[in-house]
């Protein structure tokens, strides 16, 4: 009898190990950087008009790689304006890395950082308890809506905190990605707990449409090299498989039939393409920019 499957998030150390490997093996941050360089300036064009201070809220800011790029674009548009950058991030380890990154980055003199070591839900609950509803000029939620209990309520809450000329930016996997194919088919077989759920930009679109909110959608092509997943016993392959299935030690704990089906699925054109002897998983993302 094999040991039962466990959600990857129940082992934070392994989760972050697999997440870092995912970033190293994918164009995830590269395609986000291209968006921030090319299209973000237009998004933040008028968020600070007439303001002496710009308030930015990063929900799930992680280790700050993308946050600092966003800040540089806001600074370029509004030089010398004071920026308050608040970060909601439940992982102390990620906050530590974020602070290190800030310390190593120049030109942040006019940015005041405040870190809140809590989840989005804990932040909302605390603000409600303190009867506070601070408004923001820019809120971003990058690759974090998988980790909230109630997606529509979370979007509603943070949308309600937007200033009249503000924007809410969400990045999630596309509804046209390997993730969508894999998770729509096998998600119910993976051991998700209440820490994590599968949601894609297609789901967010439905939520926004039903709330009659105005938004723009950008498609970001991205891929992840999963060739090592098909090498029996390969440590990196096993970690990437854990990340794909959100399952701790998937290779060792999944029922053989489920493992066989998932490995087959990952090779199919709906999930991946073969290029130069590599298997490249479709990691396409969507950026959704929501108006107040």
Task: Label the predicted regions.
Residues 50-51, 129-135:
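Glycine-rich phosphate-binding loop signature in dinucleotide/nucleotide-binding domains
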Residues 152-167:
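A short glycine-rich, Lys/Arg-flanked "PGG" loop and its adjoining helix->strand segment in the class I
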Residues 134-152:
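A short SAM/SAH-binding and catalytic strip from SAM-dependent methyltransferases
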Residues 133, 199, 209, 214-292:
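Conserved Class I S-adenosyl-L-methionine
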Residues 98-100, 127-129, 180-184, 229-231:
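Short aromatic-enriched loop/helix-cap "lid" or pocket-rim segments at secondary-structure transitions
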Residues 54-126:
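Class I SAM-dependent methyltransferase SAM/SAH-binding core
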Residues 1-51:
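Class I SAM-dependent methyltransferase Rossmann-like catalytic core
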Residues 166-196:
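Conserved class I S-adenosyl-L-methionine
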């Amino acid at each position: 009898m094999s040991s039962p499957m466990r959600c990857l998030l129940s082992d934070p150390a392994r989760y972050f190990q697999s997440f870092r490997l995912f970033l190293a093996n994918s164009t995830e941050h590269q395609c986000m950087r291209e968006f921030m360089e090319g299209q973000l300036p237009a998004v933040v064009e008028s968020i600070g008009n007439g303001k002496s201070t710009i308030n930015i809220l990063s929900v799930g800011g992680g280790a700050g790689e993308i946050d600092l790029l966003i800040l540089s674009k806001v600074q370029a548009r509004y030089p010398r304006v004071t920026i308050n950058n608040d970060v909601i991030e439940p992982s102390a380890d990620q906050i530590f890395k974020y602070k290190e990154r800030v310390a190593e980055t120049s030109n942040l003199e006019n940015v005041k950082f405040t870190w809140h070591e809590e989840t989005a839900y804990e932040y909302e609950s605390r603000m409600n308890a303190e009867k506070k509803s601070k408004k923001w000029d820019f809120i971003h939620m990058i690759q974090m809506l998988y980790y909230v209990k109630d997606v529509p309520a979370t979007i509603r809450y943070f949308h309600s905190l937007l200033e009249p000329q503000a924007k809410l930016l969400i990045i999630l996997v596309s509804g046209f990605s390997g993730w969508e194919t894999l998770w729509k088919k096998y998600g119910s077989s993976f051991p998700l707990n209440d820490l994590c759920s599968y949601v894609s930009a297609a789901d967010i679109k439905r939520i926004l449409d039903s709330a009659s909110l105005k938004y723009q959608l950008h498609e970001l092509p991205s891929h992840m090299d999963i060739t090592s997943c098909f090498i029996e016993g390969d440590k990196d392959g096993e970690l990437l498989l854990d990340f794909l299935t959100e399952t701790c030690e998937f290779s060792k704990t999944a029922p053989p039939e489920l493992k066989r089906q998932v490995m087959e699925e990952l090779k199919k054109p709906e999930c991946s393409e073969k290029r130069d002897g590599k298997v490249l998983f479709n990691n396409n993302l969507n950026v959704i920019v929501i108006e107040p």
